[in-house]
Amino acid sequence: MILSHRWQCTIVPVDSGRQRRAYPEGVTENLNTIDSIRLLRLDPGLPMPRRAHRGDAGVDLHSTTDVVIAPGHRELVGTGVAIALPLGTVGLIHPRSGLAAREGLSIVNAPGTVDADYRGEIKVCLINLDPSTPITITRGDRIAQLIIQRVELVDFVEVDELDETTRGDQGHGSTGRGSTA
């Protein structure tokens, strides 16, 4: 494997004897740092997404509309922004912890995924998990947070069998139950 300490790898040998790119075509920048993401404001009346505190992982996304979400119901809410992510990255839309704890507001498909080639408005599918109280969202409210992460864009290779492990095919609640052998 050819790797530099700054992740500027171009070729990785693969068991099949062929070679493939370690990162998708078009990724040439230093992958240790992403200084900025191109953002298009579709609603200039809303604040720019930004971190509440310097070390926060996510930036706050704001609602473009007023909406009332009935208990147990969901609404697709626009954020008024579109972004251009570099190949090899993903945007993850997470609930805001305070809204989840105080109001029962969450995201249906948490975390939501913004793929690198998507250029449309980021929308959030919000759900009211409170059993009895509607949630009122006002235009401009912070409704979710966006986190940018690197992803491995791998190829899948079909095989006849997988290597053996202690866990094997035990899943969904099997951890801590002891051996099935």
UniProtKB/Swiss-Prot annotation:
Organism: Corynebacterium efficiens (strain DSM 44549 / YS-314 / AJ 12310 / JCM 11189 / NBRC 100395)
InterPro entries: dUTPase, dUTPase-like, dUTPase-like_sf, dUTPase_trimeric
Family under the similarity heading: Belongs to the dUTPase family.
HAMAP family per UniProt: dUTPase_bact
Catalysis performed (reactions): dUTP + H2O = dUMP + diphosphate + H(+)
Role: This enzyme is involved in nucleotide metabolism: it produces dUMP, the immediate precursor of thymidine nucleotides and it decreases the intracellular concentration of dUTP so that uracil cannot be incorporated into DNA.
EC code(s) of this entry: 3.6.1.23
Molecular-function GO terms, alphabetical: dUTP diphosphatase activity; magnesium ion binding
Protein name in the entry: Deoxyuridine 5'-triphosphate nucleotidohydrolase
The entry's keywords: Hydrolase, Magnesium, Metal-binding, Nucleotide metabolism
Binding site for substrate: 96-98, 109, 113-115, 123
